[in-house]
Amino acid sequence: MFDFRLKVFDTVAKRGNFTKAASELNITQPAVSKHIKEIERLLNTKLFDRNGTKIKLTVSGEILLKYTQKIFGVYSALEFEINQIKQQ
């Protein structure tokens, strides 16, 4: 149900590498780049500082990562509660 772009961002942030994130998510590296660019466009900010093959979260990226974890927690709680209702 959640926005896959957030999963892509989270994976890139944790792996520190677009190619490794692509491999883990079973998508292409250009697809990873596209998802990150879409989020950057929507938020109107850079999420990563790129220096060749090295990437580092910007301050905005660090903030998004913090909220991404909270969002995933909310999604998990939502799915749990919905499943509880279905089992009644």
Indicate residue ranges for each PLM-predicted region.
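Alpha-helical residues within the helix-turn-helix
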Residues: S23-E24, R41, E62
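The N-cap/first-turn positions of alpha helices
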Residues: F2-V8, Q29, G61, T68
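A short, exposed helix-loop element centered on a Lys and neighboring polar residues
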Residues: S76-N83
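A short LG(V/I)-centered, amphipathic sequence patch enriched
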Residues: E40-L57
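Helix-turn-helix DNA-binding elements, focusing on the entry/boundary residues of the two helices
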Residues: N17-F18, I36, R50
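Short helix-boundary/capping micro-motifs
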Residues: V12-N26
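Interdomain hinge and pocket-entrance segments immediately C-terminal to HTH DNA-binding domains
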Residues: Q84-Q88
